[in-house]
């Protein structure tokens, strides 16, 4: 049930889709049923799944996949194929060709629109909620309404929501229904209708609109929900034997220890009605599929566990689009619906295989590719760029799984003969072509999506190649370690996981290569590492919980704050509440930090990247008009939607609830924020003009003295591009253009070309800020009235902050003037020091740098010569160990280059075999180490790279290199003498063991 998946702290991993995982043992399935509190695990034993089951693999169902029309054809393959035909051909009066995924989605939305529901667009996969990692349920965008934190905008709504879940990623492709990306169709009521309408409409939709045979539908209800049972049986007409009463774990949804809760009811489709009711416990995953979920929010759970009826009863439902498509299109799994299968077909053609004749392993890999490509396309479209942290890592991991899976099944290069190309863009093209109904914006971001996928794939292919090199080194170490201790060579589970997770090496390939070299693989250790990662991934999803009880009662009772700051910087207001250390008080005295709630305010509360205003609140005497209290406000935040929280310190007197105060915003700081906010809009327009319209905002900060703008782009900007961007912004500033602001319908604003921030939450009415002919954005921030007020714009820095994300920092307004004046002062000082004019500074600096480079080269050359002279004397001190000449010495303050020259000289001078290990501490708190081994020593199996790396650890560092030559460093020069002594002992022992 999706509400439970989103809200229950004990069941946040619960999926609205029954989860199937297969155990290693044959003929044994563990079915995880969707639960509200915890998972119920059933063990289905005995015989294998019957041939002909829609959920089976292999040769159970033989189908022609030549076209979408043919994909519904079933061919008898066993005695039970009559059941297969019964389970598929009886679905509805319409042919499978009528029920495309788009048609199902449209029918669902239109059905509820005809019943008074407002069709709302899918929200972003990046939720407007810091407690939620990714959008995992359709009700997420309505969460504040369900919790009473925001007023309802419409009485009831219907959506098709994009969702991402990766906590069971290893099951994708291996079961019939696990997916990372899916669509959740839903209808929602915010106190408008309740149980009877939800149930009867759900039945009408499934049986009349979609034409599902009523005799194939089973119902689950909460064991104590007699009302729902009665509606299903007495009003809808479902026989009692097909209505199952289940317990609290299965059919009762809670939002946490306290808060909104209620029973739920689920509709299941029966693939094998001829089996009767003997085993019909709805837990048979091969027989039943749950596809529609109705949650009845009717109670409030109190601290003592008791339930009280809610004043406003709500409805939250979810229907898995892919599941309904599977039923109506008569295919054996979600992947073979028209929502995913075109991507699979494309991947199969690139791998030069036929899905129809492919074995189970090949089909599994193709399903993984089909599923993951949908996920990455929608995530990147919603502004999630591949990186090593947070949501970016989810995208990167999915992309890498597709790349390594594609390579595993034989896709090379671009899949069309170009070995240097990338194949993900071709697959993404198919996914994008399927996106127009659910998210039309994906098509407009095609260029950006394809470019990001190509760059990420080519980078990862290089990583894979490095992984091959690492695997060779790890196998060498395993063989060497086994040789030293007499054990059997083994590749540790941690190393296998490193190759799998970081370098994308499939475990089976690692095991195969290791086996060829006689090395076993620690699969138990690998499984433990995988389980640890799974738990971490699960934890990321389990942060989805409500803040019910975290807000004090005073905040909940305060009405929204009226914002006056667009038109005025001062106002008279009434104190509606006071908080000190989170506790509600009536009076606060001098010296206390306080949070103040007003009925109205000119102070801007932090949002949209713009910081909250600073200023003062004043309390005056009623008779003498003298100041009785002064409160300095240093921050303003929003709480529970649109309640402004003024945070500050009582500088004088006291403030009391119910009293009138005068509020005054710091005008100079507000002007700085206005200049930087408008400059941010101009900067975004300039970026789109100079480097391409596909770039998009990834974040921003609008402060009083600076701005920071993060944007999605794959490379650093050149100096020329930065100059053009800066020049264009200043051109717009000097044009003295008047800004226009207006409030309009969201869709009208988008149609007019207004830019919306990815993932930002907007109401039906939005504020649009326009610089005519330059910029139009949805924005609730404060802005200058004319671009001339910005005064000037200067880019301070441009840098990368994550893979595919760049950041520009800049100044405008008074901060721009201060910055330019400071830079001018720096230039004056520089000219004075160099004794040149400003225009000659660059040339003079280049001359000085060239002279410095020449001097450094000369010094380095002299140091190397001195080091070689020292080395010449060391050659005479070499010891002989079993015919091998050995030199281990501390060369004092010789630098790394000199140390290298000395080692090369010694190993060339001494007769082969020879081993030279030198160390030095140049006096800068660092240690340099070098090892040079002649061919004779290398043939003994003694490698310089591994040897010097181990010694360097004693000096607080590390390093490595080739078998014959390696360098290392450290930061503990005091440990150098001891490290060299250990090096001497180990090289002597190694040579002696090889010679004996």
Swiss-Prot record:
Location in or out of the cell: Plastid, Chloroplast; Mitochondrion
Co-factor(s): Zn(2+)
InterPro entries: aa-tRNA-synth_II/BPL/LPL (IPR045864), Ala-tRNA-lgiase_IIc (IPR002318), Ala-tRNA-ligase_IIc_anticod-bd (IPR018162), Ala-tRNA-synth_IIc_core (IPR018165), Ala-tRNA-synth_IIc_N (IPR018164), Ala-tRNA_ligase (IPR050058), Ala_tRNA_ligase_euk/bac (IPR023033), Ala_tRNA_synth_plant (IPR027522)
Keyword Cytoplasm carried by entry: no
Record has Ubl conjugation as a keyword: no
An example Gene Ontology CC term for this record: chloroplast
One of the GO BP terms on file: alanyl-tRNA aminoacylation
EC number of the protein: 6.1.1.7
Residues reported in the UniProt entry to bind Zn(2+): 677, 681, 779, 783
Superkingdom of the source species: Eukaryota
Catalytic activity: tRNA(Ala) + L-alanine + ATP = L-alanyl-tRNA(Ala) + AMP + diphosphate
Free-text note regarding domains: Consists of three domains; the N-terminal catalytic domain, the editing domain and the C-terminal C-Ala domain. The editing domain removes incorrectly charged amino acids, while the C-Ala domain, along with tRNA(Ala), serves as a bridge to cooperatively bring together the editing and aminoacylation centers thus stimulating deacylation of misacylated tRNAs.
Family: Belongs to the class-II aminoacyl-tRNA synthetase family.
Quaternary structure and partners: Monomer.
The protein's role, per its UniProt record: Catalyzes the attachment of alanine to tRNA(Ala) in a two-step reaction: alanine is first activated by ATP to form Ala-AMP and then transferred to the acceptor end of tRNA(Ala). Also edits incorrectly charged tRNA(Ala) via its editing domain.
Name of the protein in question: Alanine--tRNA ligase, chloroplastic/mitochondrial
Organism: Oryza sativa subsp. indica (Rice)
């Amino acid at each position: 049930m999706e509400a439970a998946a989103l809200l229950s702290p004990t069941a946040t991993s619960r999926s609205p889709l029954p989860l199937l995982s297969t155990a290693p043992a044959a003929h044994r399935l563990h079915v995880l049923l969707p639960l509200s509190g915890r998972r119920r695990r059933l063990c289905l034993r005995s015989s294998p799944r019957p041939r002909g089951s829609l959920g089976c693999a292999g040769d159970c169902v033989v189908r022609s996949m030549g076209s979408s029309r043919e994909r519904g054809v079933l061919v008898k393959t066993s005695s039970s194929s009559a059941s297969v035909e019964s389970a598929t051909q009886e679905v509805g009066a319409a042919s499978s060709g009528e029920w495309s995924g788009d048609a199902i989605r449209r029918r669902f939305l239109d059905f509820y629109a005809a019943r008074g529901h407002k069709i709302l667009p899918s929200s972003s996969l990046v939720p407007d909620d810091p407690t939620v990692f990714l959008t995992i349920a359709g009700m997420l965008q309505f969460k504040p309404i369900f919790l009473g934190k925001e007023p309802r905008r419409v009485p009831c709504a219907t959506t098709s929501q994009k969702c991402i879940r990766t906590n069971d990623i290893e099951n994708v492709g291996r079961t019939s229904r696990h997916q990372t990306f899916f669509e959740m169709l839903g209808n929602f009521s915010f106190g408008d209708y309740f149980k009877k309408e939800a149930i009867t409409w759900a039945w009408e939709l499934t049986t009349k609109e979609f034409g599902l045979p009523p005799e194939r539908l089973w119902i689950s209800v909460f064991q104590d929900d007699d009302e729902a049972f009665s509606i299903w049986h007495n009003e809808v007409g479902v026989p009692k034997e097909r209505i199952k009463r289940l317990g609290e774990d299965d059919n009762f949804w809670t939002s946490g220890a306290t808060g909104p809760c209620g029973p739920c009811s689920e509709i299941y489709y029966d693939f094998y009605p001829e089996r009767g009711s003997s085993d019909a416990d709805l837990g048979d995953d091969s027989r039943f599929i749950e596809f529609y979920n109705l949650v009845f929010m009717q109670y409030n759970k109190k601290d003592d566990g008791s339930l009280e009826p809610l004043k406003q009863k709500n409805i939250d439902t979810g229907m898995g689009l892919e599941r309904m498509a599977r039923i109506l299109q008569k295919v054996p799994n979600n992947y073979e619906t028209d929502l995913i299968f075109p991507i699979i077909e494309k991947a199969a053609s690139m791998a030069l295989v036929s899905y129809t004749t492919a074995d189970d392993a090949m089909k599994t890999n193709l399903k993984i590719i089909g599923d993951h490509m949908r996920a990455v396309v929608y995530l990147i479209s919603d502004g999630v760029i591949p990186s090593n942290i947070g949501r970016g890592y989810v995208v990167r991991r999915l992309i890498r799984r597709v790349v390594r899976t594609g390579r595993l099944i034989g896709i090379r290069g671009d899949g069309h003969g170009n070995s240097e190309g990338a194949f993900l863009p071709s697959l993404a093209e198919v996914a994008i072509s399927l996106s127009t109904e659910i998210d039309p914006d994906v098509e407009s971001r095609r260029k950006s999506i394809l470019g990001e996928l190509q760059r990420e794939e080519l980078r990862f292919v290089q990583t894979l190649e490095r992984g091959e090199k690492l695997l060779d080194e790890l196998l060498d170490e395993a063989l060497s370690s086994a040789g030293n201790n007499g054990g059997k060579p083994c590749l540790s589970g941690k190393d296998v996981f490193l190759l799998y997770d970081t370098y994308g090496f499939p475990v089976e390939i690692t095991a195969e290569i290791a086996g060829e070299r006689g090395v076993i693989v620690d699969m138990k250790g690998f499984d433990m590492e995988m389980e640890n990662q799974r738990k971490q991934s699960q934890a990321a999803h389990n942060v989805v919980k409500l803040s019910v009880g975290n807000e004090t009662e005073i905040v909940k009772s305060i009405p929204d704050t009226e914002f006056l700051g667009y038109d005025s910087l001062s106002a008279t207001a009434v104190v509606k509440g006071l908080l000190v250390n989170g506790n509600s008080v009536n009076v606060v005295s001098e010296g206390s930090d306080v949070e103040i709630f007003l009925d109205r305010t000119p102070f801007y509360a932090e949002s949209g990247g713009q910081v909250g205003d600073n200023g003062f609140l004043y309390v005056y005497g009623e008779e003498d008009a003298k100041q009785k209290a002064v409160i300095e406000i240093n921050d303003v935040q929003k709480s529970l939607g649109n309640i402004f929280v003024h945070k500050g310190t009582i500088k004088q007197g006291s403030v009391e609830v119910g009293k009138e105060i005068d509020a005054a915003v710091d005008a100079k700081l507000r002007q700085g924020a206005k200049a930087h906010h408008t400059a941010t809009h101009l900067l975004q327009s300039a970026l789109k003009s100079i480097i391409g319209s596909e770039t998009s905002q990834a974040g921003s900060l609008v402060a009083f003295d600076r701005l920071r703008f993060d944007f999605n782009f794959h490379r650093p900007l050149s100096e020329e591009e930065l100059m053009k961007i800066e020049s264009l912004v200043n051109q717009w500033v000097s044009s003295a253009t008047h800004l226009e602001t207006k409030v309009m319908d969201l869709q009208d604003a988008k149609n007019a070309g207004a830019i919306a921030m990815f993932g930002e939450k907007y109401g039906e009415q939005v504020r649009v800020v326009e610089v005519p002919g330059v910029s139009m954005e949805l924005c609730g921030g404060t802005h200058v009235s004319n671009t001339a007020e910005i005064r000037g714009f200067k880019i301070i820095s441009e840098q990368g902050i994550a893979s595919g994300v760049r950041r520009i920092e800049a100044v405008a307004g008074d901060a721009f003037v201060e910055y330019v004046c400071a830079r001018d002062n720096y230039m004056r000082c520089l000219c004075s020091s160099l004794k040149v004019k400003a225009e000659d500074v660059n040339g003079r600096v280049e001359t000085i740098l060239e002279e410095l480079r020449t001097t450094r080269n000369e010094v380095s050359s002299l140091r190397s010569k001195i080091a070689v002279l020292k080395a010449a004397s060391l050659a005479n001190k070499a010891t002989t160990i079993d015919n091998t000449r050995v030199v281990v010495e501390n060369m004092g303050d010789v630098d790394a280059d000199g140390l290298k020259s000395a080692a090369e000289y010694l190993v060339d001078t001494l007769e082969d075999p020879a081993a030279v290990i030198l160390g030095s501490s140049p006096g800068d708190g660092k240690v340099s180490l070098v090892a040079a081994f002649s061919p004779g020593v290398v043939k003994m199996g003694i490698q310089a790279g591994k040897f010097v790396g181990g010694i360097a650890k004693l000096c607080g560092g590390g390093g490595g290199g080739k078998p014959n030559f390696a360098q290392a460093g450290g930061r503990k020069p005091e440990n150098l003498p001891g490290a060299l002594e250990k090096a001497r002992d180990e090289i002597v022992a190694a040579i002696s063991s090889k010679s004996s």
